[in-house]
Design a protein with these regions (language model features):
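Charge-lined substrate channels and their catalytic hotspots, especially those that engage the 3′ end
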Residues: 1-278, 285-331, 369-372, 615, ...
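Electropositive polyanion-binding surfaces
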Residues: 23, 174, 179-180, 197, ...
Length: 706
């Protein structure tokens, strides 16, 4: 059979890439050339056509139906792909996955008649881009060291003997796919990085960072630029053209361990009883210039990543902890928002200026809380003697602002954050619910005011910008919230109408201190749309604000740095048309990149926290605790302990006779009549903890069996 006919026959059976065709019919330079000549001839004769590098027969019409997708989830016998625009996903049965891996870009054809009515199913026609870097665990299986990917722990791949990289059974590793097979299990891999034991949370966290290409070490060119600022100081020349505020008793308030200090404050009362609030933010844009290696790297990272006691900074420490950080007692360049508020806390006006400041003291939240509560000793009062007189006014202003937030219906959802306590070796030895006091709330409100002013400034000036946007919840999420509220005995209309934030706030206030408080807080958090960055102002649903942006953390967030750069140009007199030409594309790209990287950072932080919680739980296997049912599924119950650690109780361990799920809120045993409902308390025993996967299993303690 001629090469032309072979290729036509092959493509009739299955769409193929050039790589596929050369693999089947080529092998050397001569035969590869014949393959390409035959392909060119078939295209010229309009027998085959190309889509995204994949060849189809024209008669089949399949090219027009093919969809560009990304593999987002892989199971033992299935995969899910997401359309390129992120609008919907498609289920791929195992025999149609072609060995694709998460992260691969693929071409997919949907089935006309899916097995489940109303669902989207299809097959992968071709793999266009391969993601060959994977993270997982080395496991000895049937006498051979194999690789089990985190993305699909149900499968294992062959670790090539000469590419094991010193890995041992149970090690957390990163691998590269060296040879692909037709099934995922047929892929052959080699170790690219060994992190250490998968039973240590700190090793698993490092692997999570590696999987998303987040590196603690900065590229050489970035480090070279940063080194030039290693011992930098603010000179008198640097202060030219800036408002000189160094004589004012400005100070910072942060946690004791904070080294990258973005913001400082000062507050004075006016003779009329109003307030002059100054929020002074590190002028990072003065040091990170457009087009520099520092700026390119900051754009790529977009955010600092925080987990346990570690941080992977957006900027090198020479800037984040050095010349940009508003450290105590040294001159620093700042971007200041100077606000005037009336005696009731209403914002009257504001202005933005470039300034030079000297922070008087590095305030600590716990110490400020003690001063506000009147429980501080003389030594502590002495530390804050230069700024002590501001605290009563700050407390008063915060009281007014808290009242105004409540009046407009601003939501106050408890996030349920925890604090991980580590030993000197970095192992988690305790988990505690994170608490915050009055000073934390004060600083949050003052920063919110400055952020609001920045967004208002941009909208009034009609300049390109990066806004923080939070849209109202969608109908599907509201339906789930409605079901949850009904289960907790709370009547609402959310299944039909979008609630106002004020209505949601009223529900939160109504359950505060009760058994359903944490469950409903969590339910509302899950109901909310994800806040994102956009170049158009669309308001902030949760804060009930027309204008909002992120201005106050340019050391750790790129959107803040981006709008500093844009606002600086406007303050220097750049006209609107020039600003639109220069910054419109920049604002759009910064918004997109920052939104994407923020999601990745949040996922890493959440997964790392789960690993540390599991590490803590391993120390307490066999111990009993009281917990509350925080989630109900057909498979079993999620139980949250008082310290925020959550585990799973399989339905099979609840009763031997089987259970029945009622609207996602209750499991019932129809034989014995036992019920397990959201919000119920129960005694559990910790029976398993998988640090690698961040999963904890509980069993019902005998004394709590009902």
């Amino acid at each position: 059979m001629a090469m032309r006919d072979k290729i036509e026959h092959a493509i009739q059976n299955q769409p193929c890439t050039v790589k596929d065709l050369k693999s089947k019919f080529g092998g050397d330079r001569g035969s590869d050339r014949k393959v390409m000549e035959a392909v060119d001839q078939l295209v010229h004769e309009a027998v085959i056509c190309q889509r995204q590098g994949v060849f189809f027969t024209v008669r089949s019409g399949r090219a027009d139906k093919a969809l560009l997708c990304k593999v987002v989830k892989l199971g033992k016998n299935f995969a899910f792909v997401m359309l390129e625009d992120g609008t919907s996903d498609i289920f791929i049965p195992g025999r149609f996955t072609r060995g694709a891996m998460p992260g691969d870009m693929v071409l997919v054809e949907k089935f006309e008649h899916p097995r489940v009515e109303g669902s989207d199913e299809g097959e992968i026609l071709a793999i266009l881009e391969e993601k060959n870097d994977l993270v997982g665990t080395a496991r000895r299986i049937e006498g051979r060291l194999k690789f089990v990917p985190d993305d699909c722990p149900a499968i294992s791949m062959q670790l090539m003997r000469d590419c094991e990289g010193g890995a041992k059974d149970g090690d957390k590793v990163a691998v590269e796919i060296l040879q692909r097979g037709n099934r995922q299990e047929d892929h052959r891999v080699g170790v690219a990085m060994r992190f250490g034991s998968s039973d240590e949370a700190k090793r698993c966290a490092k692997a999570l960072l590696y999987a998303q290409d987040i590196r603690s070490r900065f590229p050489d060119k970035v480090r070279e630029e940063a080194k030039k600022l290693e011992n930098a100081e603010v000179s008198e020349k640097d202060t030219e053209g800036r408002m000189d505020l160094r004589a004012l008793p400005i100070f910072t308030i942060d946690s004791a361990e904070t080294k990258d200090i973005d913001d400082a404050i000062i507050l004075t009362k006016t003779p009329e009883g109003g307030f002059e609030l100054g929020v002074h933010i590190a002028d990072v844009s003065n040091y990170v210039k457009p087009g520099s290696e520092l700026d390119n790297e900051a754009f790529n990272r977009a955010t600092s990543v925080y987990y346990a006691d570690q941080v992977v900074p957006m900027l090198p420490k020479q800037l984040s902890n050095g010349i940009c950080s508003l450290n105590e007692g040294v001159l620093r360049l700042a971007f200041s928002c100077l606000m005037h508020l009336d005696k009731d806390g209403n914002l009257i006006d504001y202005r933005f200026v470039k300034s030079v400041i000297r922070s008087r003291v590095k305030g600590v939240y716990s110490e400020i809380n003690a001063l506000l509560a009147g429980s501080a000793d003389d030594e502590l009062k002495g530390k804050y003697h230069e700024v002590l007189s501001q605290l009563p006014a700050m407390k008063e202003l915060y009281g007014h602002r808290a009242r105004l937030r409540k009046e407009r219906g601003c939501m106050d959802i408890e996030s349920g954050e925890v604090k991980l306590i580590l030993d000197e070796d970095g192992h988690c030895i305790d988990v505690k619910k994170r608490t915050s006091g009055e000073s934390e709330a004060m600083i949050e409100e003052f920063m919110l005011l400055a952020n609001q002013c920045a967004a208002h400034f941009a909208r009034v000036k009609q300049i390109p910008f990066v806004y923080r946007v939070h849209e109202e919840p969608n109908a599907e999420k509201l339906e789930r919230l409605h079901t949850l509220l009904q289960a907790c005995g709370i009547n609402d209309h959310f299944a039909k109408d979008v609630p106002t934030p004020k209505e949601l706030s009223a529900i939160l206030e109504g359950v505060r201190g009760g058994p359903y408080e944490q469950i409903i807080n969590t339910g509302m958090l899950r109901c909310m749309s994800k806040a994102v960055y956009e170049e158009k102002p669309k308001g902030h649903y949760g804060l009930v604000l027309k204008d909002y942006a992120h201005f106050t953390s340019p050391i750790r967030r790129y959107p803040d740095l981006a709008i500093h750069r844009i606002m600086t140009a406007q303050l220097k007199g750049m006209d609107k048309d020039t600003m639109v030409l220069r910054y419109s594309d920049f604002a759009e790209k910064a918004s997109k990149q920052s939104s994407e990287r923020e999601i990745i950072a949040m996922q890493i932080e959440r997964k790392a926290e789960d690993c540390y919680k599991a590490e803590y739980a391993r120390r307490h296997l066999g111990e009993c605790y009281e917990g509350r049912i925080s989630g109900v599924t057909q498979r079993g119950l999620f139980i949250e302990l008082d310290n925020g650690v959550e585990g799973f109780v399989p339905a099979s361990s609840l009763t031997p006779s089987g259970t029945m799920l009622t609207e996602g809120i209750r499991l019932s045993d129809p034989v014995s009549g036992k019920n397990w409902s959201l919000g119920d308390t129960m005694m559990i025993t910790i029976v398993r903890a998988d640090v690698n996967l961040g999963k904890i299993d509980f069993e019902v303690a005998p004394a709590s069996t009902k």
